[in-house]
């Protein structure tokens, strides 16, 4: 009887040591070849975070949402799950592009993407070149129309998926 009790206790202890799978899906580094750009436009050229050829930022055509972030940015970490959820619903209707700024090492940005469920293209701006084109601070989210015109700039953290959906409908005319 003592052995049975000991076995039972061991089973309970082992059951308590199991982990549940993470709610965050695995992200992936996506190349930037799917982005629609106007090749005649000159401007701030950034490489893709995956190491592939990048784009000239001002040449981007939408409809697109551009989210400027950094792995070191607390509010960016806070809002990223909202972008992941939003993108799962909106990926067939618009382009989502991230720009990783002022990162100490490219590996930090790549790790951020891979561990937060991010599955859209991201550009890499290690030295703040986008500041002249986009302004300073993170997070910032831009809504870009089909002609490449920024129609709205949200400064600060996105607080809900509903906010993203509302801004997308209001400024890009796309219901998600």
Summary of predicted features, one role per range:
Residues 111-119, 125-176:
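Thiol/disulfide oxidoreductase modules built on the thioredoxin-like
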Residues 42, 64, 138-139:
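Short loop/turn microsegments at loop-to-beta-strand junctions
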Residues 55-77, 83, 96:
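Short active-site neighborhood of thiol/selenol oxidoreductases, capturing the structured segment around
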Residues 54-55, 151:
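Generic structural signal for well-ordered beta-strand positions
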Residues 48-51, 144-145:
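Short, acidic, Ser/Thr-enriched surface-loop or helix-capping motifs
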Residues 1-47, 166, 174-176:
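N-terminal targeting signals for export/organelle localization
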Residues 77-116, 126-132:
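Structural microenvironment flanking redox-active thiols in thiol-disulfide oxidoreductases
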């Amino acid at each position: 009887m003592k052995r049975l009790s000991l076995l039972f206790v061991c089973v309970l202890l082992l059951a308590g040591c199991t982990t549940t799978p993470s709610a965050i899906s695995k992200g992936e580094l996506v190349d930037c070849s799917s982005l629609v750009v106007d090749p005649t436009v000159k401007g701030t050229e950034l490489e893709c975070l995956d190491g592939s050829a990048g784009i000239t930022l001002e040449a981007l055509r939408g409809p697109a949402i551009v989210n400027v972030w950094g792995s070191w940015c607390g509010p960016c970490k806070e809002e990223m799950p909202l972008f992941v959820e939003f993108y799962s619903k909106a990926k067939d209707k618009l382009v989502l592009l991230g720009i990783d700024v002022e990162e100490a090492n490219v590996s930090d940005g790549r790790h951020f993407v891979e561990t937060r469920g991010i599955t859209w293209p991201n550009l890499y701006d290690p030295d703040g070149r986008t500041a002249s084109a986009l302004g300073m601070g993170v997070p910032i989210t831009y809504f870009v129309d089909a002609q490449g015109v920024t129609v709205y700039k949200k400064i600060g953290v996105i607080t809900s998926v509903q906010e993203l959906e509302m801004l997308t409908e209001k400024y890009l005319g796309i219901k998600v």
